[in-house]
UniProtKB/Swiss-Prot annotation:
Role of this protein: Part of the twin-arginine translocation (Tat) system that transports large folded proteins containing a characteristic twin-arginine motif in their signal peptide across membranes. Together with TatC, TatB is part of a receptor directly interacting with Tat signal peptides. TatB may form an oligomeric binding site that transiently accommodates folded Tat precursor proteins before their translocation.
Organism whose genome encodes this protein: Acidovorax sp. (strain JS42)
HAMAP family the record matches: TatB (MF_00237)
Transmembrane segments: 1-21
Major localization class: membrane
Keyword Phosphoprotein recorded: no
Name listed for the protein in its UniProt record: Sec-independent protein translocase protein TatB
Amino acid sequence: MIDIGLSKMALIGAVALIVIGPEKLPRVARTVGTLLGKAQRYVADVKAEVNRSMELDELRKMKDTVENAARDVEQTIHTSASDFQKDMEHSLGDASATGSTYGVDQGLSTVVPAYKHPAKNWRLKRGAMPQWYKARAGVRTRVQSGAARVARFRPQKFH
């Protein structure tokens, strides 16, 4: 930026004091300070905008390279698929020409059955647990009411 030393600033201050006068100098100094602050903020905003545009350009270039790579992969997949399809048609044509019926009579259907989520039976899963594990884990296998438990464990009366 501008190289202003202490001696130059003192000279500028003395000239301003003589030209402007002591009563208007504080107001002029405040105005100059606010204008310098605005100029610094404007320069900082311009620098930020330039940096942002440079980053956007880099991102655009990166996006273009990724899109080109994706197109190349897609093209490779399409060529491989078409080569595979041509080979299959060629081999099926050879098989039908030689009299082989494998694959021709079967129809090579491409019908794939729909996926059905297996229903979980939690009772079966619970029953598949070993008995010794149930006893250790405190799993109740025979649930009784409170009165039935008392009657079961009540000592017998002797007559």
